[in-house]
Amino acid sequence: MKTIQKTLGIFIILFSMLISPIQAKENSSSNWMENISGDTKLSALSIPGTHDSATQYVSLSPIFQCQDTAIKTQLENGYRYLDIRLVLKNDDLILKHNFAKCRKDKSIFSTSLTLDDVLNDIYTFLDQNPSETVIFCVKKENSKDDLNKVKSILNSKINTNSWYIENRIPTLDEARGKIILATRFKSEYGLYLNWEEQGDRTILDVPHKKEDINVSESLFVQDRFNYGVEDKVQAIEYCLENSMSNDSTFYLKFHIHEW
């Protein structure tokens, strides 16, 4: 599988079984899901993703750039989980990292990257690779934004032929060719993937937070972004050891590299 050079903030989503992309036949990073059985639940896959996925071109890039490739390229390179941070701008949604604006190109005069820009790239990718699916995890980046307005604009973009919007972990066949909506806020549509802030440096015996997706499915998250290297490795190892239990639990693990 291709790697993204000098990529910052990459995280891997580890689910309850480990079925690696390289176990699919050597066709392409663009369609590594093609030869995985369609009755496999997404919680039984190990799926790579990116953190602050839209930050290839971002204001104050030395501080806020987490990726040096576009979302289109990330998908072509095999990543299937996107971390999308949305902010209201008039009657539209744009992408930001904290207060830093994500831009369409590297020019400081470039306009803001919009939700439509990102969705168009994903639609194109899925049209070309119908065996694949993309988890689209949305966070409201500005706490002052009206959540109902954010949801209204987001929901207006949804075409049920192109999106999976149930609050239930799907099988691969249910999700192929579609965007899987996930939100970190309560919504009438999509998987509810929410967790409390985990920046505390305090070492916990069980460094994960369990949340309910629905009455029968759960989310375990390791997002200890303030841990030092040794403690972070311990947290990652714990997640690996405990992510084989069942396919009704999402295991979401953040770790950071630069290479």
Task: Report residues per predicted region.
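Bacterial N-terminal signal peptides that target proteins for export
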Residues: 1-9
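Bacterial N-terminal signal peptides
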Residues: 9-18
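Long, acidic (Asp/Glu-rich), low-complexity accessory segments flanking structured domains
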Residues: 24-79, 88-128, 183, 187-193, ...
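Loop/turn elements at helix/coil->beta-strand transitions in domains of secreted/extracellular proteins
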Residues: 77-80, 129-135, 160, 176-178, ...
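Catalytic cores of phosphodiester-bond-cleaving enzymes
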Residues: 110-157, 161
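Acidic, His- and aromatic-enriched active-site or binding-groove loops in soluble protein domains
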Residues: 155-174
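C-terminal active-site rim and adjoining tail of enzyme catalytic domains
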Residues: 182-259
